[in-house]
């Protein structure tokens, strides 16, 4: 924690600098950032799991307490309005007492609807950042999530401070332990549901604490890109395992994927080829490189794999240009990572939010930025046997270039994805996932 405390001081200085610049530019008194409010289930008295506003989490690791507020202007000491009601029904959050508290003036709020008494009196000159625009309107905010402020903050959130990088290393370190436990569970015969339980136990986080719903897919389920069903019964035959799962640390996410074959076979060789390709793509990352160019390079590598494993005929360039590789690799190479799994700013050209669209032939690419130091991105190439996409190839002449017998052999295995979390530095790449022990 000593390292975090040291880095945190500079982190707060940077956030204050950003706020000072944008509020001066927009002639605002400052920003009021709302952690959020509970959401109640329809016709019930139970709330959905609470998720704090990422703009709130950027300042401090208060992740599970609704009705909190930050008042910041970039000049004065940030003010934290911390919700601590008198409540005998629920666990009430303890008064904060961690390394970060010295950087805030903390005021306690006992009743959520009395927050106006603690907010600035000239509230119309402050901008509200948060989800609950109806609450902001009642409180008197006239500027609510202004585009200019949001675009500025989102653009700069892609540049991580040392504090943020350290949090993400720790999120990776935790997730690596979970991945190792899940791998062992797979080879020991566990079901998807059982693998999930062993993963969560290893990371020490519940389903609502990990940053996203884990993908635990055996066999053909690996062909479903966002598979979260978790079957309780084991398949009749154990062939393959794809796990896409992360962990959280102080609000920052890791997002890691591995694929395993149960036996040494052709599918296992394809995993080895994909692993080699993924590492080669990571070696291509450096400041000044356009992320879409890395995505296009991935399609070239997927095309070569289709040829090498007798899944398609022709030449690699032709397979890419005809969209054949997109049927086997339909998603983007990766995305920005940070406070959110699919972090903001991935399409921003500048502080004004000028949008860089994804290439027309690759609409699912989630990042079009030019790489720069201290950005963190996922690198997650894949190859899948997805019947709905391959059936489209069958409907025209492109289907003649597919070796359908080879495709049929791989169909029961579902697919492959390998994903690492990578920091772009000025003179090197830091593959957090690999460097923290996950092969």
Curated annotation (Swiss-Prot):
Transmembrane segments: none annotated. It catalyses: Xaa-L-Pro dipeptide + H2O = an L-alpha-amino acid + L-proline. Its cofactor is Mn(2+). Its EC number is 3.4.13.9. Keywords: Dipeptidase, Hydrolase, Manganese, Metal-binding, Metalloprotease, Protease. Splits dipeptides with a prolyl residue in the C-terminal position. One of its GO terms (cellular component) is cytosol. It comes from Shewanella oneidensis (strain ATCC 700550 / JCM 31522 / CIP 106686 / LMG 19005 / NCIMB 14063 / MR-1). Mn(2+) 2 binds at residues 244, 255, 419. GO terms for biological process: proteolysis. The keyword Phosphoprotein does not apply. Pfam families: PepQ_N, Peptidase_M24. This is Xaa-Pro dipeptidase.
